[in-house]
């Protein structure tokens, strides 16, 4: 992180190509397509394949980079990155953690993936060199590895490097976790690190912070921190590259930190003012149209010449201003001439098509090579519309404007439209559900209203709530509280309402009255509210619970569940149950004189049952 030592060494530095150990090395990504690494004039990439330096087969760590690394850790470690106490670094491993015994070194590397263990002349050693070049860029620390920096920018770079080293840089240590301690939690995965396990400790993160060896990775790229060198910032560990990007923007062209007061920003990335140019021809793109490909800007001419798609219909380039259709790696111009059936040339824009062996067809008949036939009633009916407006956007799907067509379908309907004519009435067209047809709602089915007769007047329209209407509608209402006639409301408290009441007097003269009233109650529960007029019968009056006579001037309400049982209300095993004292009142002469049913002023009992022999009552009773 320090500047180079003397001005004389800096001025007498040879060109980068003469001392670059990566020059001529093959590219690991392009293989034989790249003739060898050749550093670009100001980009940190190869001039041939456009790949970065670390993608090429660099066999050894550059000397300058190793010196920079030594200075980076000079305040933390007195030895170099290859010094250790194991004695096996030069024999088996290209690098080992310092201060470990041989058995501890094996224990540490056993926690890492096999392809990342830095054995000598192994993929792990190549991985280490690649990560050194990527995670610790030399141009982030010293100005001599940068291009065209102003004096003010060089001062800012030196101050930037010293600040990072002073506040963020650190090198982790590896040691066995003490057995006497109960254990710790890994800062990355959150799992337990037990006593006797190998652990990585970072002093910048605090005394208790530790990681599993395989968990000590950069927060941004999730790669192992090479040689345990880390930068601690805001409670997280970073590699050198991504920590610098947390503080300053990085130019996407030259890969250097931007210290100039002005820069270009596009699509969340940054460039130096003079570096925002075409990736191929390096023409300036300031105020020009460009295409971003793999985070690299291209001018329109270079993009069409190098990366534009070829049309599978005509074989020509698909321009940037031309719409295109794409399907599973195939591309067509968004025109009727190119995107059409390969046999009958029927336009397919906005219509379904059948791909077969790299070609597209309008129907199965065309795909099989037979003559096309007109669509029948059971076939797909294909629209004959055409595209009337040109498409100017390059997207995968288009909404084409279709002309007049006899069918309203776009190839998705498999049945012809019904012929025009008088509509046949359907049984289900007006089949809106009624309340009486929904037993799941807890409602009873309403019977059909009886035929009107001179002696039975028609019911009121509001009384029949379940009757059919001319325009049925679905109407969900709460279930009715009472299924019978008007509900009788008692003024007594609920506890008193549940007590049995005294029965009415059972006289032969009342049998006909009671039988008629029971039948009328059934009609009321079925929704029929006809008033039966019988000559010689007394009118029905409301029962008064306050009469309290033992002869039974009051009966149970119509909603009582025991109104139709074999046992009379107020009787148990044939014996009358007396009323409680608070419901009884002294009988007067007037009350006694009104207990006979021959008096026209006496209200009739609302509901009672005919007199039954005691033997019958005894047989049908149920002892609770």
Curated annotation (Swiss-Prot):
Disruption phenotype: Prickle3 knockdown results in reduced respiratory complex V activity, altered complex V assembly, and abnormal mitochondrial morphology observed in the retina. Mutant mice exhibit degeneration of retinal ganglion cells, fewer retinal neurofilaments than wild-type mice, abnormalities of the retinal vasculature, and significantly reduced retinal function. Residues 1-12, 509-541 have a biased composition (Basic residues). Widely expressed. This is Prickle planar cell polarity protein 3. One of its GO terms (biological process) is cell projection organization. Residues 74-182 form the PET domain. Keywords: Cell membrane, Cilium biogenesis/degradation, Cytoplasm, Developmental protein, LIM domain, Membrane, Metal-binding, Mitochondrion, Phosphoprotein, Repeat, Zinc. Residues 1-26, 371-617 are annotated as: Disordered. It is found in: Cytoplasm; Cell membrane; Mitochondrion. Interacts with VANGL2 via its C-terminus. The VANGL2-dependent membrane recruitment of PRICKLE3 is a prerequisite for its polarization. Interacts with WTIP. WTIP is involved in the recruitment of PRICKLE3 to the basal body. Interacts with MT-ATP8, a component of the mitochondrial complex V. Residues 447-458 have a biased composition (Pro residues). The modification Phosphoserine is found at residues 475, 491. It is a peripheral membrane protein. SMART domains: LIM. InterPro entries: LIM1_prickle (IPR033725), LIM2_prickle (IPR033726), LIM3_prickle (IPR033727), PET_domain (IPR010442), PET_prickle (IPR033723), Pk/Esn/Tes (IPR047120), Znf_LIM (IPR001781). Involved in the planar cell polarity (PCP) pathway that is essential for the polarization of epithelial cells during morphogenetic processes, including gastrulation and neurulation. PCP is maintained by two molecular modules, the global and the core modules, PRICKLE3 being part of the core module. Distinct complexes of the core module segregate to opposite sides of the cell, where they interact with the opposite complex in the neighboring cell at or near the adherents junctions. Involved in the organization of the basal body. Involved in cilia growth and positioning. Belongs to the prickle / espinas / testin family. Residues 587-601 have a biased composition (Polar residues). Residues 383-409, 545-564 have a biased composition (Low complexity). CDD domains: LIM1_Prickle, LIM2_Prickle, LIM3_Prickle, PET_Prickle. One of its GO terms (molecular function) is zinc ion binding. Residues 184-249, 250-309, 310-373 form the LIM zinc-binding domain. Pfam families: LIM, PET. Signal peptide: none annotated. One of its GO terms (cellular component) is plasma membrane.
């Amino acid at each position: 992180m320090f500047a180079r030592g003397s001005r004389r060494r800096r001025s007498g530095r040879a060109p980068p190509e003469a001392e670059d150990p990566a020059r001529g090395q093959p590219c690991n990504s392009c293989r034989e397509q790249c003739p060898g690494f050749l550093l670009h004039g100001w980009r940190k990439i190869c001039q041939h394949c456009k790949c970065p330096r670390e993608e090429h087969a660099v066999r050894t760590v550059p000397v300058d980079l190793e010196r920079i690394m030594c200075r980076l850790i000079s305040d933390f470690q007195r030895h170099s990155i290859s010094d250790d106490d194991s004695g096996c670094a030069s024999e088996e491993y290209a690098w080992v953690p310092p201060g470990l015994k041989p058995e501890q070194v094996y224990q540490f590397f056993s926690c890492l993936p096999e392809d990342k263990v830095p054995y000598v002349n192994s993929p792990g050693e190549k991985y280490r060199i690649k990560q050194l070049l990527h995670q610790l860029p030399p141009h982030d620390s010293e100005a001599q590895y940068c291009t065209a920096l102003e004096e003010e920018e060089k001062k800012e770079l030196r101050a930037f490097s010293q600040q990072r080293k002073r506040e963020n840089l650190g090198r982790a240590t590896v040691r066995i976790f003490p057995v006497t301690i109960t254990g710790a939690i890994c800062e990355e995965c959150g799992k337990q690190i037990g006593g006797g396990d190998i652990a990585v400790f970072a002093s910048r993160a605090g005394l208790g912070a530790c990681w599993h060896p395989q968990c000590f990775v950069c927060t941004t790229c999730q790669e192992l921190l090479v040689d345990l060198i880390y930068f601690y910032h805001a409670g997280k560990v970073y590699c050198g590259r991504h920590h610098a990007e947390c503080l300053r923007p990085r130019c996407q062209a030259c890969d250097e930190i931007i210290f100039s007061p002005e820069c270009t920003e596009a699509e969340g990335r940054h460039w130096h003012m003079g570096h925002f140019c075409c990736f191929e021809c390096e023409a300036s793109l300031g105020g020009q149209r460009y295409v971003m490909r793999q985070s690299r800007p291209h001018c329109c001419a270079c993009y069409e010449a190098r990366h534009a798609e070829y049309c599978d219909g005509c074989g020509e380039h698909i321009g940037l201003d031309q719409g295109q259709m794409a399907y599973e790696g195939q591309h067509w111009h968004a025109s009727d001439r190119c995107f059409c059936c390969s046999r009958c040339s029927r336009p397919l824009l906005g219509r379904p098509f059948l791909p077969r062996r790299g070609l597209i067809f309008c129907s199965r008949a065309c795909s099989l090579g037979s003559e096309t036939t007109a669509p029948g009633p059971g076939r797909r009916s294909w629209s004959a519309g055409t595209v009337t407006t040109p498409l100017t956007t390059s997207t995968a799907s288009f909404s084409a404007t279709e002309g007049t067509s006899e069918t309203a379908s776009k190839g998705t309907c498999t049945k012809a439209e019904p012929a025009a004519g008088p509509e046949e009435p359907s049984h289900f067209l007006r089949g809106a559900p009624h309340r009486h047809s929904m037993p799941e709602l807890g409602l009873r089915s309403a019977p059909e209203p009886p035929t009107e007769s001179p002696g039975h007047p028609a019911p009121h329209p509001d009384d029949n709530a379940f009757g059919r209407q001319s325009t049925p509608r679905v109407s969900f209402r709460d279930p009715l509280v009472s299924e019978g006639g008007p509900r009788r409301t008692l003024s007594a408290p609920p506890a008193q309402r549940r007590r049995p009441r005294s029965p009415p007097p059972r006289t032969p003269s009342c049998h006909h009255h009671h039988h008629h009233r029971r039948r009328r109650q059934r009609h009321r529960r079925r929704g029929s509210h006809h008033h039966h007029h019988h000559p010689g019968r007394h009118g029905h009056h409301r029962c008064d619970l306050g009469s309290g006579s033992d002869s039974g001037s009051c009966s149970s309400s119509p909603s009582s569940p025991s109104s139709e049982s074999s046992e009379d209300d107020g009787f148990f095993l044939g014996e009358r149950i007396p009323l409680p004292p608070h419901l009884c009142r002294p009988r007067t002469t007037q009350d006694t004189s009104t207990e006979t049913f021959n008096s026209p002023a006496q209200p009739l009992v609302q509901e009672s049952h005919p007199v039954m022999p005691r033997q019958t009552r005894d047989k049908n009773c149920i002892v609770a």
